[in-house]
């Protein structure tokens, strides 16, 4: 939906009310906290140094304008682009100057060092580009001069260059994906700027020189639009990405055009629109693909990683040669040694293959301008042929001489030496590469030299590319990952030789030596048994090529666990371990989160590092002074309490803990003259009772002995002292001042204090009386907490306490006169007849929040008997506290102050997902009667109770009020438990909240912090009191709640907001927000609500303005909510050259919003992610990592750990969560260190913003090829010399798909993306430019993982087809009689599959869980997962990955698949599961099942049940999991009634005719056509290979017909041809029946029935005659079905490939009809086990238990959910 163009008056507010984004740069007189910083004023003032710059012609340049305005008028930039980049530049310069160490001498002026560093960083890519092309850089160096004027001019010139680049970047729209294109634009515009600054004259006019374009939107119209239209034309010609990649130019092709000087010659400046680069020229003469051509072929996996395959194939050849020899060691036999030389012939042959692949895929790059490429491709082919021939000739000469001499004569040995000399010449380049590998710094230096000599020397090996140079790591990292891979490769090769290759030698020889074997069919290739040998070796070779992935998985898991162990992960695994280290926790928090006082000199760095390391060691192991020695009055204790309490309050706001748990967890401030630190109650529980017990046992022991026993536990000491001080204060508080009772009490406490000081407690008092005093004190506190406050009871208790303390407590009983003399009894005579305290009680009012809160705390300390192991009760709260506390003992950079930290932004792309759950959504029920809210109430039961408690405190009287008064809170509560935008926004805004509070603590004085603890209690909430033992919590009249409770928020003075805003911005790229607003979508209102509640939130969207006449203008708009105006306001509106989406939608959405981000870093956050307040506190530490060298480079991407928060919903979600967790933790840990190949995988990584801005941004967007857009940011980073690290002391929450269908769609999306990656230029360049061992790491963690997963499935296919061939051909029977090795072979192959299944998925999870949760819990979790059939899920997922990865490489068809992020508890219908899994799993499983059944019928080995089971158990497991998993993990999947309904629904769907607009879920025909979409876009080779693969189905018929009795053991080819006659007859009968049905079934039904009768009669007659007059049996008929059914499916599959030729013929109707019957047949096969299990009693309950076992273990009533019974 588009809106009309806004008028000028409404487009923007009046100038006096100009809207600003973060800081009001336009008006420095505004009262804004950011403007108090001199650095901000200095940066803005520097921009106003216009001086004597010439005024742009035809423009109104006013004195108020600055350099940005001048550039905007000079080059025609948009006004809002200028405003946007002005703030961007000022903020960055100001933040950079704040961090400057030592601080500048003149803080009111911009330090030139800051600007110079920024200019070098921002323009480094441009300067490298100029050096690469050999052109002069137009950024002139500043003049070194101390003269003030020159310094100002230099500063201005630097500012102009930086500002010019930012303005170009800010308005380039989609061109930002092409960084070298921007370099080209900047290069020429900087040249024009230099001419203007130099005052040069135009050669044509003789007038002062001005840029070639100017005016309103001149840059957009003259530069951006022509290039944009070219990109747009290319994308449109791709037919929505379905055409081959080689047929059109994508972003990378157009960008790489600027990697050569021909761009400078062709495009010129101003741009020559007639150039063949632009879309103005015909496609035939236009510039084609540049740099690389993406061809769709499996050969890409070999071509990109040829070094790996050469290694594997050459070792395989060498191992076979050695294994076939009869010597123990190869050096014992010269024949074997010489035979090993054939590996060099193979090596040369593989190089020849590589050259052929290069030429066949990249030929379209050749043109008149790139003739050197043609020469290189040709020469490489010729040289490869020459080496192959040369090696072959020299090798043949060796054997000819040896055969001639009969022995290894001297002449023969000389020819061996000659051969080795040739080998030496051949491997010289490899030796040179080895030398450079050992000294990587030299290789980096050579590669980065832009010299013609270097290009000439490397021309043969590499194409000249701007990226992929200088990628070697440092020597230390080099050694680490080299050792890792040497160990892995050594293990793999030893295992392969002894357990794979050698065991096959004997069976191979036995087969080749079979001379008298006869085949059971017509054998086309004689009786050499080579096909049988090939079938024997094929699965072994596939396992050999694949199992390096297994060994990598094993060793990477071990290394990852070891690194995690040394990183101190998992040392605090639970709350109990946190209790033990809580005393050191505060010191650790202060050490890491509290900034140090920076010295003026940055020296002594190594000394500081050593001191920090020692301090961290002391903290970690409790050495030195812990926190228990710090008194409660010290600022450090208060600082820690403020942060800790803020974390606890955040938990309460998230409803993770209850009000009562807040009281138990919080660290209250000092009050009531308590002399010790007031530890959280959950630490002090039971400690006082233990102290009383010790006092009772040691009542006669000396004081120091008793006190030392109590002090053995710091918590016990504090509990005793706090209890005494609190009781003392409480009793004196409730007694009136000036009364005699007060005097007595003061004297009594004074006496006790004196005895304590003199260590006479045990000497003077009877400690056994303490227990009675304890009971009375508890009664007193309970009466005080009673809302009714019955004073007479309190008087009685006080009187009893007085008598105990005055009369019974002392060992020496004192008389009344003695007590009066000591001041411990009333002096007046009346007091003898009156009770004490009757008229002396003055209870505090009920609104005294502090008093009653402390009363409850003291009561808890006095009464708690259990150790409170379940505080907090919520699992997520416990895990978060444990991780946060553990992370503070890990190594991390120390945090700077907020003012000196690096600024950063968070960017989240959003399209149209849920923002908040609406009221109707929460109430809507599914077919089982389950609403979303009901589901959440059961899953998050404790959190729902906490929410209700909070709502009651905030005014809700009952649950009905929640649906009226508190419906917004209800919606938010539900939304925060789903994968919604509101959850993500809340999590990211914790950064803002944390920075505000940290900024206050950084700048607060000691008095401010002390005030925080004094003011806080008065603003605290009062929680609930316990009424007389009843567990029902009753609110007290004095209840209130406030964020002031932590003692921070209420102290914020305003400047903290400015600091936080300058350091953090959150931009959500809501691409269609404008459309949502225009049509009144509820999501627009909800997004506005989020902006209103979060100051730092900004929304970027694309606005489409209809100009009429079919013209539309597109604008990138940034909006915020103005708290003063109380409405949404528009900040920037920047016109785009056209529609936003040319490539993939998500990166385009990110790209348009990227210009609105701020800061040095940018964190990419997806819509399904979350964050926590306690983690946000550590962001300053993380950003400091950008300043540290990791290896030889500083990081450009900081990897952040993820915590999957959707693992507790169901067992299926747990499986996915466990798999994902091991990948995002252990996997990423190893990739970063030691392997140094971590990329960006869509994680919440933090990018160095100004490193990526000039290098193409944070993702790639080319259509289809970049469908996995995020990982290409990592590829691009590595290729351009970046460094990616991984940090596990901070984590971000992440949601994962929780239903099988959702998970499958996600797996399909990722697998398809990897299929496209395999074709991409980035993967090819990384495969060639990384050193050998990093290349191995890269392969096995990206494309190789999916390729090897596919090889696993291929191995199963090859093994089963091979066994079938051996069985049906008769070779197996003959071999069985002479050898039993084949049985061992089957066991070996099955062990391989089981090893893969276990180690691929289990080992990383077990080790990571062992590290973070402990070994026994990890083993128990693994056993539990197996009992819940996790292996079924992982095997099923393997099939999904295999299907989509293979199909994408072969045919394409990758697309974005919306997985959905809802809650999955509803039952999925059979038809839906069939549509999703029929082609990916069901048909493949049925095929394998038929193979096993045929094999069981005809194999002599299968007659032994044990051998058959041993050989096929893993295959049957795979078949079972592929068929049954969609129903096993489907709620109510085995409910009989649902199964019956599903079958009816499936039949109705199958026979639905459909129509033009019918969807796939409504009609089988529509779905069937959609399943063939990939065949429409595939190439000729894809179709040909598909047909070749489909030919396998004909093998069933070929092999089985010869085993029928009617064949009479004949092996003539005629038997097979006759069987085709039967198929033709069956098809003819079917066609006749279908034709009769269409022609006569409606109007002439009798004719139709007559024809049916004739057909049936004729068929029965033919069958009876054959049974009577031939040897055909009924069994033959049944077996023929096994033969003809696969043949029919093969014919249909081939017909689908040939659809363009058959569509217009009558054959196609028959194909459709037969295909429908086949899907009915397959559906019935799949439905059969489901129906059987549904019919069996009790199986549904078992399935529910399996699926939701995790929920059961947490006490959730999933059975109630599934039954839809809402219990009240």
Curated annotation (Swiss-Prot):
Intervals, Extracellular compartment: 330-335, 392-421, 502-530, 1363-1386, 1435-1481, 1530-1583, 1634-1649, 1695-1719
GO-annotated cellular components: 1,3-beta-D-glucan synthase complex; plasma membrane
Residues passing through the membrane, by range: 309-329, 336-356, 371-391, 422-442, 481-501, 531-551, 1342-1362, 1387-1407, 1414-1434, 1482-1502, 1509-1529, 1584-1604, 1613-1633, 1650-1670, 1674-1694, 1720-1740
Keywords per UniProt: Cell membrane, Cell shape, Cell wall biogenesis/degradation, Glycosyltransferase, Membrane, Transferase, Transmembrane, Transmembrane helix
Membrane topology (UniProt): Multi-pass membrane protein
Annotated knockout phenotype: Plants develop collapsed and inviable pollen grains.
Residues exposed to the Cytoplasmic side: 1-308, 357-370, 443-480, 552-1341, 1408-1413, 1503-1508, 1605-1612, 1671-1673, 1741-1768
Expression (tissue specificity): Ubiquitous.
Annotated InterPro entries: FKS1-like_dom1, Glyco_trans_48_dom
Origin superkingdom: Eukaryota
Location (main, coarse): membrane
EC number in record: 2.4.1.34
Reactions mediated catalytically: [(1->3)-beta-D-glucosyl](n) + UDP-alpha-D-glucose = [(1->3)-beta-D-glucosyl](n+1) + UDP + H(+)
GO BP: any one term: pollen development
Keyword Magnesium on entry: no
Subcellular location: Cell membrane
GO molecular function: 1,3-beta-D-glucan synthase activity
Task of the protein: Required the formation of the callose wall separating the tetraspores (interstitial wall), but not for the callose wall surrounding the pollen mother cells (peripheral wall). Functionally redudant to CALS12 (GSL5). During plant growth and development, callose is found as a transitory component of the cell plate in dividing cells, is a major component of pollen mother cell walls and pollen tubes, and is found as a structural component of plasmodesmatal canals.
Family, per entry: Belongs to the glycosyltransferase 48 family.
Protein name listed in UniProt: Callose synthase 11
Organism listed in the record: Arabidopsis thaliana
The encoding gene: CALS11
